Amino acid sequence: KLFSQKVRFKADDGDQFPEWEEKKLGEVFEFYNGKAHENVISENGKYVVVNSKFISTDGTVRKYTNEMIFPLIKKDIVMVMSDVPNGKAISKCFLINENNKYTLNQRICCLRTKENAVFYINQISRNKYFLKFDDGVKQTNLRKNDILQCPLLCPCLAEQQKIADCLSSLDEVIKKQKATLAAWEELKKGLLQQMFV
């Protein structure tokens, strides 16, 4: 409902924000291709290599390197550009959360904007526009020009911030609930072990 504009925020003074504009992704973001890291992978490296496995697992599966070949900065959106037919990783995105920690691998792109990346990541990740490139038969490879043509709905910066703040708050609640659930599952596991010893 948010991106269909059925739910809208108001300005602090109670006024309506202006209508959203439709723009191409290339009008809002700078695009960068990643670089090959296969020859510099190091088990004890100090930088995280952002590859498709990293993004598709929300950052839990990691490879490391000691060479910062393509440095990423906080608020960069990284997106998977290649996947198997009917794969679940194509156009999946990850928001970079700190500087000097991540380096961008090939077949992953970096989308950088001066606008609110937290707002846009929810609109870009697994966008239907990108999913239509998957024909279910051969590997899907998104090209730079195709990515830059993706249509985006763009509210004014003040409304972007309100939306991003709301979504970030919800993400925080979800994170805390997952931690609570994990604690309950551990408690249950411990009780079951004690019951059947």
Language-model features and meaning:
Residues 1-19, 179-197:
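Short amphipathic coiled-coil heptad-repeat segments
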Residues 3, 19-22, 43-46:
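A short, polar/charged loop/turn motif at coil->beta-strand junctions and beta-hairpin connectors
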Residues 7-9, 163-174, 193-196:
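Hydrophobic structural patches
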Residues 6, 10-35, 149:
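Non-catalytic DNA-recognition/assembly elements of restriction-modification systems
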Residues 26-154:
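DNA target-recognition domains and sequence-specific DNA-contacting regions of bacterial/archaeal
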